[in-house]
């Protein structure tokens, strides 16, 4: 979905207040602009910080030397986590945490979680990355994108489902569900450590 309407007023939402004390900012993740990606973002410099504030539904780009806020993305996500620099775009794990109430007073959830993509050249172009397997989380959650010459791999962690999902473009090619005797054991902070070995192993599995 492109160019979704901004969601400004959900910062008033007091989700998970029965579990945690409410924090007005709750900075929950930071990603450093590395040399690998800095050439794709000419308005930013290597070392600039991409910082997520869960409670404000906001992601900031900050110069760590001057503390200048170079950019702000507000109202695009709800209770997001894990913003990442990529090759000319930014991805954010959008929990889309929101509960409604059905006719008998039970809490219901209208939306799954998602990964959004913000194009650097045209920042008004906001896309939801489409995958053939859904995931849903209230907090945490992370993603890692690996682009090769001919495809894009996405690693997605849905912590409270105990899900680790690996996608080749939009197709799920590997899943790990961390359940034990009906209990979910949460995952957190998955990352592709050896990019070359991942591609080699996937190619071997295809043969």
Indicate where each model-derived feature is located:
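Histidine-/acidic-rich catalytic cores in large beta-rich domains
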Residues: 1-207
């Amino acid at each position: 979905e492109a160019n979704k309407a901004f969601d400004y007023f959900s910062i008033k939402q007091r989700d998970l207040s029965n579990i945690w004390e409410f924090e007005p900012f709750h900075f929950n993740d930071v990603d450093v602009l590395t040399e690998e990606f800095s050439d794709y973002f000419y308005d930013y410099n290597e070392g600039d910080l991409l910082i997520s504030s869960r409670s404000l539904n906001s992601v900031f780009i900050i110069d760590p030397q001057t503390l200048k806020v170079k950019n702000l993305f507000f109202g695009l996500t709800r209770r997001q986590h894990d913003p990442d620099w990529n090759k000319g775009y930014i991805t954010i794990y959008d929990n889309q945490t929101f509960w409604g109430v059905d006719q008998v007073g039970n809490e219901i959830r209208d939306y799954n979680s998602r990964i959004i993509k913000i194009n650097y050249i045209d920042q008004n172009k906001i896309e939801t990355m489409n995958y053939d397997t859904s995931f849903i989380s209230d907090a945490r959650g992370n993603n890692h994108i690996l682009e090769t010459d001919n495809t894009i791999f996405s690693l997605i962690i849905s912590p409270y489902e105990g899900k680790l999902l690996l996608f080749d473009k939009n197709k799920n090619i590997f899943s790990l569900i961390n359940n034990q005797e009906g209990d979910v054991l949460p995952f957190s902070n998955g990352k592709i450590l050896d990019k070359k070995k991942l591609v080699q192993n996937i190619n071997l599995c295809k043969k």
